[in-house]
A protein has these predicted regions:
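Conserved SAM-binding motif I beta-strand of class I
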Residues: 84-89
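Conserved class I S-adenosyl-L-methionine
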Residues: 61-70
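Conserved SAM-binding strand-loop segment of SAM-dependent methyltransferases
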Residues: 105-116
């Protein structure tokens, strides 16, 4: 069981990568991310987010969706744990690298080159939806993800937050909150930098 906590924080920051500045929410710019992923530098880590690792402990593997999968670090981890994984990203290069890594590891991974606006989440199709460092949550997202998840399915979210403190919570009032943070902390892929980060693990209520 995760802790539920609300933490006051002070600042937000921009992450600076080897090819320039990244403004979160820019994931739909495929040409930009193709350039980032094509540098040959190890810009992003390949291990999964700690939040996701903890979120699936004790859960039976099922169908998982990784929104904005990038190079596939979370998708590949889930596939290694026995989940049936679909991931998508608008970056052809990111998806290519994810497919390549999965193949080398002998893993089955459905990796698609598509933007979020063109991907049909479906209805009661997923046991897990993951969205890390893609964009900020919008008010209508909670309903969309609830429809797409099966009963007791979970949504795992992590991103920089430049909005109001704890605003994310009001979008998920009907959900069971397993973990929440809105903190000034280090990113898991840039531990030397302090960023304002929000993390959420929420479970869809069982069908009545």
């Amino acid at each position: 069981m995760f802790r539920f906590r609300r933490t006051l924080l002070v600042t937000a920051a921009l992450a600076v990568l080897g090819v320039g500045q990244v403004f979160w929410g820019q994931q739909d710019d495929s040409s930009y991310w193709n350039k980032v992923y094509s540098t040959g530098q190890t810009i992003f880590v390949h291990h999964p987010t700690e939040l996701l690792v903890n979120a699936i402990k004790g859960r039976r593997p099922g169908a998982a969706l990784d929104i904005g999968m990038g190079q596939g670090r979370n998708s590949i981890f889930l596939a290694q744990q026995g989940w049936e994984v679909t991931g998508f990203d608008p970056s052809e290069e990111g998806v290519r690298q994810a497919r390549e890594r999965a193949a080398k590891l002998g893993l089955h991974l459905r990796a698609l080159v598509v933007g979020e606006e063109d991907f049909d989440l479906g209805t009661a199709q997923w046991d897990l939806i993951v969205m890390t460092y893609v964009r900020r949550i919008r008010p209508e997202d909670a309903g969309r993800f609830a429809r797409a998840l099966r009963p007791n399915g979970i949504f795992v979210y992590e991103n920089n937050n430049a909005g109001k403190q704890n605003e994310l919570l009001k979008y998920f009032l009907a959900w069971r909150i397993l973990h929440f943070e809105d903190v000034d902390t280090s990113s898991d892929w840039h531990p030397e930098r302090t960023l304002r980060v929000e993390r959420l693990v929420a479970e869809k209520p069982p069908a009545e």
